[in-house]
Amino acid sequence: MTNIVFMGTPAFAAPILEGIIENGYNVLAVVTQPDRPVGRKRVLHASPVKEVALKYGIKVFQPVKLSGSDEMQEIIDLQPDLIVTAAYGQFLPTKLIESVKIAAINVHGSLLPKYRGGAPVQYSIMNGDDKTGVTIIYMVKKMDAGDMLAQAELKIESTDDTGTIFEKMSILGRDVLLETLPKIISGNVEAVKQDENKVVFSPNIKPEEEILHLNLEAKEIDWKTRALRPAPGAYFKNFKGKRTKLWSIKPLEEKTEFAPGYVVNVDKHELKVSAYNGTVYSIIELQPAGKQKMDITSYLNGVGQGLKIGQRIIEDEE
């Protein structure tokens, strides 16, 4: 029986862990991020991966910092055949990677070498890509740079956001991993080097990247709102005087002479706004600061009452 240590944290990784367990591999331990405080009462919540581990009675390690920790030495002492990682959230020290009997492998959420880093799904949507996927790689010291062992594509639909892509990708990642594991264990896997000339990075989203600007076309505003949904959300700093998140919009075919940020058309159930380069979009769902999410009808009947065609409602500065 192959002994595995699994390392992962979010919902994306949970079906992958469960698939490994259900397919007869012996999971010696699970390593995940520490429980996080959630909500106004700051109640500690276990990661989705920890919940799976507890369900199956598997030992859990949650080091604040893995490198140099007592937990890392305990993991090494388990002498696993494989380490499998999926969105764990910390770098793996070389000492740990090199301690395994067969290999340390990673399930990465992109078509490598495109989008190395912590936010591959967000960047694929934000850049308007029509596909993404998963890649199984050997783990090396350099981030997401190991040889590729398997890869599978996933279509990005016009309605997809980061949440829906992660849901689909977790199942795809599970299936591709389970198909590839026997080849890795037997030594019959073909390892393909990544083309360093085609590397694109996708670092974690910074707070300033959540801001929507008036130099974006309607389709780019759509890409960004979907990339940052369900969290943290994309926002204009000054939308009718308030910081306002746009949760859902629809880019339209029509064009306008208005500069970006003006009301192109408004009635009881629709608000069309001008964007860069004469493009236009319709707002479907939004959230002014201090308010709950609301559909556009609720907004126009409340906070947004009295808007008129030709009125400027968005500015780049607060």
UniProtKB/Swiss-Prot annotation:
GO terms for molecular function: methionyl-tRNA formyltransferase activity. CDD domains: FMT_core_Met-tRNA-FMT_N, Met_tRNA_FMT_C. Keywords: Protein biosynthesis, Transferase. It comes from the Bacteria. It catalyses: L-methionyl-tRNA(fMet) + (6R)-10-formyltetrahydrofolate = N-formyl-L-methionyl-tRNA(fMet) + (6S)-5,6,7,8-tetrahydrofolate + H(+). Pfam families: Formyl_trans_C, Formyl_trans_N. (6S)-5,6,7,8-tetrahydrofolate binds at residues 110-113. The keyword Transferase applies. GO terms for cellular component: cytosol. Signal peptide: none annotated. Attaches a formyl group to the free amino group of methionyl-tRNA(fMet). The formyl group appears to play a dual role in the initiator identity of N-formylmethionyl-tRNA by promoting its recognition by IF2 and preventing the misappropriation of this tRNA by the elongation apparatus. Belongs to the Fmt family. HAMAP family: Formyl_trans. This is Methionyl-tRNA formyltransferase.
